[in-house]
């Protein structure tokens, strides 16, 4: 069993590169690209993430993909409880033992869920914050899924591929503004909170990671459903170089009906989807699905 290194009593020990590799060897784990496994091996980076997440000591933190537990330990130091969702059964089996070894007495504050995060709709505790090093290949769907199913999530900080971070935090009019940007804005305010270098991971990815912080707000007031609004967003960006009149023709049933909806929403039919904010998409959905229909 990998034991914690001795550190000054005032500073709780965190796992470093040697600890992570030794622990992985103990359980026969080799990081896989399929699951997007890149483990954080730098204690200072862990402390930076936890500090940037601004976690209160009364909060329950949801962590997705805890892996070998390096970030988990930092979160346990800051939060009242940590609920970790892990898809890999080998990693999940080892996590409670790691918590006991590195944070004696904190195991009662640690709750493990063996599952695919995209399938989780219930948790042992209602989380108030999301802090996670997310696999690059599923980062956006996971964030949107969790915000949809856990309204108790009020804020968070996620580490994702740097260009994905830019897209999540993009604003209307930007070249990288797209489906992730608009859908995320339904749930809250997203902002870029920093960049993480490649050398703090094992194995080291080929690109930098970005930190995205979010604060939840109420969804737009509308009689249209979230599904109806998101359908407009998907249609608008499926052909993002086309005018909205053309891009929404399939969604509306015809170009003329798309134009009618756009005009009813007070929008220019010749505009493109990348210039509209979430409230504009809500108005388009409302025009297509009137309350008295």
From Swiss-Prot:
Physiological role: Specifically dimethylates two adjacent adenosines (A1518 and A1519) in the loop of a conserved hairpin near the 3'-end of 16S rRNA in the 30S particle. May play a critical role in biogenesis of 30S subunits.
Domain of life: Bacteria
Recorded GO MF terms: 16S rRNA (adenine(1518)-N(6)/adenine(1519)-N(6))-dimethyltransferase activity; RNA binding
PROSITE patterns: RRNA_A_DIMETH, SAM_RNA_A_N6_MT
Chief localization: cytoplasm
Pfam families named in the record: RrnaAD (PF00398)
UniProt-recorded name of the protein: Ribosomal RNA small subunit methyltransferase A
Entry's localization field: Cytoplasm
Enzyme Commission number(s): 2.1.1.182
One cellular component term from this protein's GO annotations in UniProt: cytosol
Region forming the signal peptide: none
Residues that bind S-adenosyl-L-methionine: 38, 40, 65, 86, 116, 133
SMART domains: rADc (SM00650)
């Amino acid at each position: 069993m990998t034991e914690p290194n001795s550190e000054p009593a005032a500073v709780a020990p965190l796992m470093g590169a040697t600890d992570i590799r030794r622990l992985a060897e103990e359980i026969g784990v080799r990081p896989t690209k399929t699951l997007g496994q890149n483990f954080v091996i730098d204690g200072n980076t862990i402390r930076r993430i936890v500090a940037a997440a601004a976690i209160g000591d009364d909060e329950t933190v949801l962590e997705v993909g805890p892996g070998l537990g390096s970030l988990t330990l930092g979160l346990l130091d800051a939060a009242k409880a940590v609920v970790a969702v892990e898809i890999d059964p080998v990693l999940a089996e080892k996590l409670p033992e790691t918590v006991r070894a590195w944070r004696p007495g904190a195991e009662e504050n640690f709750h493990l869920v063996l599952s695919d995060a995209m399938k989780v709709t219930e948790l042992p505790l209602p989380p108030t914050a999301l802090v996670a090093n997310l696999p690059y290949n599923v980062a956006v769907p996971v964030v949107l899924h969790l915000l949809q199913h856990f309204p108790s999530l009020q804020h968070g900080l996620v580490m994702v591929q740097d260009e994905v971070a830019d897209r999540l935090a993009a604003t209307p009019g930007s070249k990288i503004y797209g489906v992730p940007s608009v859908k995320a804005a339904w749930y809250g305010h997203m902002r870029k909170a920093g960049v993480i270098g490649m050398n703090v991971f094992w194995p080291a990815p080929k690109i930098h990671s970005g930190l995205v912080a979010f604060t939840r707000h109420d969804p737009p007031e509308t009689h249209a459903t979230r599904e109806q609004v998101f359908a407009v967003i998907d249609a608008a960006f499926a052909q993002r170089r086309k005018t909205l009149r053309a891009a929404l023709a399939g969604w509306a049933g015809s170009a003329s009906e798309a134009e009618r909806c756009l005009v009813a929403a007070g929008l220019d039919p010749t505009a493109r989807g990348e210039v509209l904010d979430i409230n504009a998409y809500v108005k388009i959905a409302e025009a297509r699905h009137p309350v008295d229909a």
